């Protein structure tokens, strides 16, 4: 009987401990906790190679103005080499989407590798649209950092 009560007491104590304190500490916990709350998502997307270095493209979506708008970035992150940690070697911003006077609020961001380049599809709402329609943008980012941004279904200007 005493053994049964001891087991129940042990289980009750275990259940009272918050799950977060039971999780094992990780190497990256401090860095992850240091991420700004405005970073909405980070997507790995394809591989790049330049001279003797290689790595992964990283797409970063962030909220601005308390979530009223969104911004998009692509970063080149190196693969770690023999004790040399990963580094961000380049960051590209998209002025067509990241304008705080004409903000877009992203509904979804998807990315896929296309050979050495990447293509990002952004579905967003524009703050000045009266009909609150969903716009779609395709962004092709080349290995050197140049890009082409097109709005799907947009009228061509003369």
Per-range role (PLM):
Residues 5, 17-20, 91:
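Compositionally biased, intrinsically disordered low-complexity segments
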Residues 1-9:
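Bacterial N-terminal signal peptides that target proteins for export
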Residues 22-158:
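Exposed acidic/polar residues on beta-strands and adjacent loops within beta-sheet cores, strongest
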Residues 9-17:
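Bacterial N-terminal signal peptides
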């Amino acid at each position: 009987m005493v053994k049964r009560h001891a087991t129940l007491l042990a289980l009750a104590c275990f259940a009272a401990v918050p799950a977060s304190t039971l999780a094992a500490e990780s190497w990256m916990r401090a860095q992850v906790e240091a991420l700004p709350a405005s970073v909405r998502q980070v997507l790995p997307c394809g591989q790049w190679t330049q001279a003797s270095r290689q790595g992964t493209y990283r797409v970063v979506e962030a909220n601005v103005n308390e979530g009223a708008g969104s911004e998009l970035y692509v970063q080149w992150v190196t693969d770690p080499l023999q004790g040399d940690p990963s580094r961000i070697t380049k960051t590209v911003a998209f002025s067509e989407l990241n304008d705080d006077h004409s903000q877009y609020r992203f509904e979804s961001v998807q990315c896929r590798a296309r050979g050495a380049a990447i293509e990002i599809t952004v579905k967003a709402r524009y703050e000045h649209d009266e009909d609150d329609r969903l716009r779609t943008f395709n962004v092709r980012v080349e290995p050197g950092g140049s890009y082409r941004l097109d709005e799907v279904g947009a009228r061509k200007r003369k």
